[in-house]
């Protein structure tokens, strides 16, 4: 689809895309539905997504032109774009949590044009986080998989330094979670995946152990590996099966944070919550301050990059197909 190159106004910034990560959540937009379980679906229209849409929310780029009110960025700068925009005016947005805005979600690549394009118009200069000399292809995934896992792991508090985190899923998010957890000086991770190749890749990336989530005794294996049950489960898949496994593997007082959007529904005996002191919460991407923190870790060399596979922008459909088929280890990043 051909579109005219936008002209930045106000504090807007026009960037030339240098890298755009291909995220599993793009598949939901590509297919047009989210699975709610029991045969129910949420469509793009239900979510407020209008078509046609340029996808891509993991965006790195070079600043080409800025609006007259933009003072903090200049042409030639390399940046990663924070895409999870809200109304910018409500109390939630003023707290720096635009990703949780309930007034007007404006996420790039979801509700407004994203990074699968030659040029991208960023609505305000504050969303351009300077990369310095960091590799744009390696840092583009920080805008979603990076800040998502970072924000989710922070929700566990000090327990990540005391005991291993159980990570459900060894795809791009799983590999990023391993890297982020290491940068946060965590105790380590036990990774769960049904794919043997991905389990081995997780081990190669530093997991303490990797367990087949489809094994009949998977929960017993997790309980044994954690020394009596998990205190922190990060579900990067978000399916009925992974969440049920996480609950079955949880120690009393443990907590599950759900990130993945695979879909389905949860059936849980309510008495489990108080009697087991169990915590269950969702985590939706992350905030702009958290992305800046994460980029800072990368600039210090504390956060190691995950494996990225560069493909031309023209291969976006093929990249999405490969991701849907479970053939991607690490992250596919589209480049011009």
Task: Enumerate the predicted regions with their spans.
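Short, well-ordered coil/turn residues at beta-beta hairpins
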Residues: 19, 82, 234-236, 336
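Rossmann-fold dehydrogenase core element
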Residues: 255-257, 267-307
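C-terminal hydrophobic helical "lid"/dimerization subdomain
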Residues: 196, 240, 244-248, 288-336
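Glycine-rich cofactor phosphate-binding loops and adjacent beta1-alpha1 units
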Residues: 156-163, 194, 200-279
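Glycine-rich beta-strand-centered segment in the early N-terminal region that forms part
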Residues: 4-20, 35-91, 132-134
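NAD(P)H dinucleotide-binding glycine-rich loop of Rossmann-like/cofactor-binding domains
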Residues: 42-57, 87-168
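Mid-domain Rossmann-like dinucleotide-binding core that forms the NAD(H)/NADP(H) cofactor-binding site
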Residues: 127, 133-216, 220-221
């Amino acid at each position: 689809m051909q579109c005219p190159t936008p002209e930045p106004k106000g504090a807007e910034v026009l960037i030339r895309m240098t890298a755009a990560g291909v995220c599993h959540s793009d598949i939901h937009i590509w297919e047009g539905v989210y699975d709610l379980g029991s045969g129910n679906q949420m469509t793009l229209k239900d979510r407020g997504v209008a078509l046609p849409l340029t996808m891509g929310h993991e965006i790195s780029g070079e600043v080409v032109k800025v609006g007259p009110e933009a003072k903090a960025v200049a042409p030639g700068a390399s940046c990663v774009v924070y895409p999870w925009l809200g109304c910018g005016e409500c109390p939630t947005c003023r707290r720096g949590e635009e990703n949780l805005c309930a007034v007007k979600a404006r996420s790039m690549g979801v509700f407004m044009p994203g990074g699968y394009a030659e040029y991208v118009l960023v609505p305000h200069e504050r969303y351009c986080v300077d990369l310095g000399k960091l590799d744009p292809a390696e840092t583009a995934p920080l805008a979603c998989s990076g800040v998502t896992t970072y924000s989710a792991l922070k929700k566990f508090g000090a327990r990540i330094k005391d005991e291993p985190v159980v990570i459900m899923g060894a795809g791009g998010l799983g590999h990023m979670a391993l890297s982020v957890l290491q940068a946060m000086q965590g105790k380590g991770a036990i990774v769960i995946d049904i794919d043997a190749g991905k389990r081995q890749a997780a081990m190669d990336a530093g997991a303490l152990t990797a367990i087949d989530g489809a094994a009949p005794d998977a929960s017993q294996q997790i309980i044994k590996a954690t020394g009596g049950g998990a205190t922190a489960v990060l579900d990067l898949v978000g399916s009925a099966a992974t969440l049920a496994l996480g609950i079955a593997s949880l120690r009393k007082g443990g907590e599950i944070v759900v990130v993945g959007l695979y879909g389905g529904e949860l059936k849980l005996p309510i008495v489990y919550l108080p009697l087991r002191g169990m915590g269950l919460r969702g985590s939706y991407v992350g905030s702009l301050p958290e992305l800046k923190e994460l980029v800072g870790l990368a600039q210090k060399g504390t956060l190691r990059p995950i494996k990225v596979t560069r493909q031309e922008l023209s291969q976006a459909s093929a990249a999405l197909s490969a991701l849907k088929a479970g053939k991607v280890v690490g992250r596919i990043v589209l480049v011009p």
